[in-house]
Amino acid sequence: MEGYHFLLEILSKNPDICECAIIESALVIPMDFTYKMIEPIFNLSYCLISKKWFSKLQFKSLKLKKSLFALYYEDTCKITKDNLIAFMKSNSNYEVKNTLSHTKAKTLVLVGSKERPIMKKSATKIVHLIPNSELEVLQGYYHGDISINHADDYVERVKRLVR
């Protein structure tokens, strides 16, 4: 489960738990085909994860700051195949609960303009479920980009939300 899954579950079960929330790049629409392909693909390709050249390709596709590569590579090498498969399956199969509509939290939903269409659909779905929410499409941003690569912009949005 990713961090936003925990947040969405908590908001779904405890509508009064917080006053404000930020949800960034959350996938809440199950991807059935992807889910079915995860195990066979990772059974075949897991051995590549510890190869530095492959990690560099993966890292580049994530659009992270170059200064984060050493940490990324170190963490990636520690992930077991079973944990990676479980994580990917959980992520691709998550479906937001309708009880999310009961939350009272003022919520900012962020998604990058350069994210995949399913991520934008997920953001829209969340905004339709949460009564006091706002969607912000971040122009030129990729998946998870603002909190990782543009922390100052992220902090400004947090400050605006809690005012």
Where are these regions (language model features)?
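Short, well-ordered alpha-helices that flank and scaffold nucleotide-derived cofactor binding pockets
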Residues: 12-16, 125-128, 160
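Conserved alpha/beta-hydrolase catalytic His-Asp/Glu region
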Residues: 32-34, 48-101
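Acidic catalytic loop of the alpha/beta-hydrolase fold
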Residues: 114-118, 144
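Flexible "cap/lid" loop of the alpha/beta hydrolase fold
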Residues: 8-48
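Short beta-strand/loop motif that positions the catalytic acidic residue
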Residues: 103, 109-111
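Short alpha-helix in the alpha/beta-hydrolase fold that links the catalytic acid
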Residues: 105, 119-128
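Glycine-rich nucleophile elbow surrounding the catalytic serine of serine-hydrolase chemistry
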Residues: 1-9
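Catalytic active-site module of serine/aspartate enzymes centered on a nucleophile-bearing elbow/loop
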Residues: 133-163
